[in-house]
Amino acid sequence: MLQMAISNLDGVSSAKVEINCVIAPHKAQAQIPGLANVKNIVAVASGKGGVGKSTTAANLALALAREGARVGILDADIYGPSQGVMFGIAEGTRPKIRDQKWFVPIEAHGVEVMSMAFLTDDNTPMVWRGPMVSGALLQLVTQTAWNDLDYLVIDMPPGTGDIQLTLAQKVPVAGSVIVTTPQDLALLDARKGVEMFRKVNIPVLGVVENMAVHICSNCGHAEHLFGEGGGEKLATQYGVEVLASLPLAMEIREQADNGKPTAIADPNSPIALIYQELAVTSGRGLF
């Protein structure tokens, strides 16, 4: 439209308009060194498992990429890594090693992906103590050769223990997104997640409420299976915004299981547009 308007001006025979968007780097903790080739790190966390944190992280990364950003995702959920499956990366895929030191992330759907699952067998449980896991995770963070990323999304392990604290204190996270369901038990643990980030001076960008409502595919009846308004209550309590409220929908699960999360499997669907808005508001929250 701008190009057309300029072309229609008197004395203008032709016009060419180029728009260049530059994403600025942000770092909440000045004392922590930045990560090479990464501008902004966004941690996606939850107080407990089973609330859809990993699905949210995957769709957030893909939605950011659809906005034109260069994006990577790090699966920091050591005990239950799932990003490889969600991004359709074949079992047994291993990252290349550069200069005998750097892991080269695997690219899928336009996003760079790194996970401990790429370095271990899928059937082997991670029977490691906290300090060992923390050390391995820091090595994964600092020795991955990311390629000039605007955003690195970290899929955090659930909870608020040693692993989460180590990441929060030693990785230059710019902001965090808290994922919860409306259920009281989930909200109780989500509050602990918010408090943890506040104690280490990492901004909480907002809350994502998963499984907010279920709509019957046969009759269209809406039912709040896990309670109602929990995400809004949590956001109000801590003075942050609800970044997204997502339904309990079968297609979200099916598309993630099939290796193409909703943000790219059905990009024009109402649910995908919610993820797209989540990407925009999360990015805006860093500024």
From Swiss-Prot:
Keywords: ATP-binding, Hydrolase, Iron, Iron-sulfur, Metal-binding, Nucleotide-binding. SUPFAM superfamilies: P-loop containing nucleoside triphosphate hydrolases. Pfam families: ParA. ATP binds at G47, K48, G49, G50, V51, G52, K53, S54. Disulfide bonds: none annotated. InterPro entries: Mrp-like_CS, Mrp/NBP35_ATP-bd, NUBPL-like, P-loop_NTPase, YlxH/NBP35. Belongs to the Mrp/NBP35 ATP-binding proteins family. Binds and transfers iron-sulfur (Fe-S) clusters to target apoproteins. Can hydrolyze ATP. This is Iron-sulfur cluster carrier protein.
